[in-house]
Amino acid sequence: MAEEQARHVKNGLECIRALKAEPIGSLAIEEAMAAWSEISDNPGQERATCREEKAGSSGLSKPCLSAIGSTEGGAPRIRGQGPGESDDDAETLGIPPRNLQASSTGLQCYYVYDHSGEAVKGIQDADSIMVQSGLDGDSTLSGGDNESENSDVDIGEPDTEGYAITDRGSAPISMGFRASDVETAEGGEIHELLRLQSRGNNFPKLGKTLNVPPPPDPGRASTSGTPIKKGTERRLASFGTEIASLLTGGATQCARKSPSEPSGPGAPAGNVPEYVSNAALIQEWTPESGTTISPRSQNNEEGGDYYDDELFSDVQDIKTALAKIHEDNQKIISKLESLLLLKGEVESIKKQINRQNISISTLEGHLSSIMIAIPGLGKDPNDPTADVEINPDLKPIIGRDSGRALAEVLKKPVASRQLQGMTNGRTSSRGQLLKEFQPKPIGKKMSSAVGFVPDTGPASRSVIRSIIKSSRLEEDRKRYLMTLLDDIKGANDLAKFHQMLMKIIMK
């Protein structure tokens, strides 16, 4: 099969080169077109011509070129033509004899016949013919030569398995596929096909036959259909189109009343619903409703995934909404998880605050028991409160162990030292601090908490500037006093300036 295909391709290329080298004359083309129109207008004459070819007659009223067979030399020849008739038939077409081999392939055509011999119209491309299974009632494609010279197996030769082998091209095809794929069947498939043909014996004649479906009705095809296959030689769209489905979703259309009387007993039709042209969705059938299930609903029950367009869109909308809800739920769950983490952190913060409160309470308790040291010396003798006795309850040392602290810092009175041997001896004299723990007296010529005494140091000038800035004097006077302070030199002048400044502020 592959060798035949390669030979056909080679012959076609040679014909194309010959046509380019020596084009066919316009007169020959017109005569060929006239012959083709006569064949199309007179199918009976075409059938008679092909029957004469099958019977082996040497004369042809109209040439019928083969689309399948080829000569041993590689060039296509005219069907039913003898060895010496090529020149006469070439002269009938108006083609020069020397260019017949090169130009005859340009006039090739395909003929498809059924079993009755009727020509099938509308076939433009043999590759687009879909082959169906079956032995009876199918049309056949007749295109073989009488001599079976291209057959690989002789007619009637017994097979190794015991089956009568006929021509390879006469085997019926058991599965539907294109005519161009017929030649790819090899090996066991060929033997199986030949075995089925030998058992059938339903073909009236031998030869290369193919089971093909009847040509489709162009009137029933959808006008908006797009071609599903392009031509191979002329690059024209074939007859195959996508036919729109005639099934419509909805309720069953009403049936017209039959004029004939029913032969059998009638059935009540009181619960028949009113007629509707179409319905978007058919509910499940119930005996009370009287509605019928459409074929599409039955297909759904059988397992086919067929949905009405509107129902399918509704389902898609529901799926989209569910996906959106699921996404929102995931976001809410993530936020709740973050809230749970924050709740744990808040609990830990509360625990830390409680521990800090406990620590603060402990410090408050400690501060309540701390002894405050108030020195009894260092006061100004002119102060009227200098002779006031210090509260004996105020301890002069910071500490919690008052007994140990007092024993370390207080010196015992003389009376207590004299009465050490007396167990019940008590004295009214108070204890006094040791000299190393007694504060030194405050000097009158040094700055202290009692009063400010200016000196030549920068700290004294800074204190005076602060006094000027914090006073309620006018800004002009403040600036004037600042300039005077910068011009003063010496400790005595600075002390006088300080006394003058205090008098101005106190006014």
UniProtKB/Swiss-Prot annotation:
Domain notes: The N-terminus consists of a long intrinsically disordered tail. The central part contains the coiled-coil multimerization domain (MD). Forms a four-stranded coiled coil structure. The C-terminus constitutes the alpha-helical domain (XD) that binds to the nucleocapsid (N-RNA complex).
Name by which UniProt lists this protein: Phosphoprotein
Compositional bias per record (Low complexity), positions renumbered to this chain: 134-145, 260-270
GO biological process, one term: viral genome replication
Keyword terms of this UniProt record: Phosphoprotein, Viral RNA replication
Keyword Transport: no
Composition-biased stretches (Acidic residues): 146-160
Family per record: Belongs to the morbillivirus P protein family.
Chain residue ranges for the region called X domain (XD): 457-507
Gene3D superfamilies: 1.20.5.110, DNA helicase RuvA subunit, C-terminal domain
Region of interest: Disordered: 41-99, 134-163, 201-231, 250-273
Summary of the function given for this chain in its UniProt record: Essential cofactor of the RNA polymerase L that plays a central role in the transcription and replication by forming the polymerase complex with RNA polymerase L and recruiting L to the genomic N-RNA template for RNA synthesis. Also plays a central role in the encapsidation of nascent RNA chains by forming the encapsidation complex with the nucleocapsid protein N (N-P complex). Acts as a chaperone for newly synthesized free N protein, so-called N0, allowing encapsidation of nascent RNA chains during replication.
MF annotations from Gene Ontology: RNA binding; RNA-directed RNA polymerase activity
Start and end residues of each stretch annotated as Interaction with the L polymerase: 361-377, 396-410
Post-translational modification: Phosphorylation on serines by host CK2 is necessary for the formation of viral factories.
Sequence positions bearing Phosphoserine: S86, S151
Ranges for region Interaction with the nucleocapsid (N-RNA): 459-507
Complex and partners: Homotetramer. Interacts (via multimerization domain and XD domain) with polymerase L; this interaction forms the polymerase L-P complex. Interacts (via N-terminus) with N0 (via Ncore); this interaction allows P to chaperon N0 to avoid N polymerization and non-specific RNA binding before encapsidation. Interacts (via C-terminus) with N-RNA template (via Ntail); this interaction maintains the P/L complex anchored to the nucleocapsid template during the sequential transcription. Interacts (via C-terminus) with protein C this interaction allows C to associate with the ribonucleocapsid.
Region span, Multimerization: 304-376
Location of region: Interaction with N0: 1-48
Superkingdom of origin: Viruses
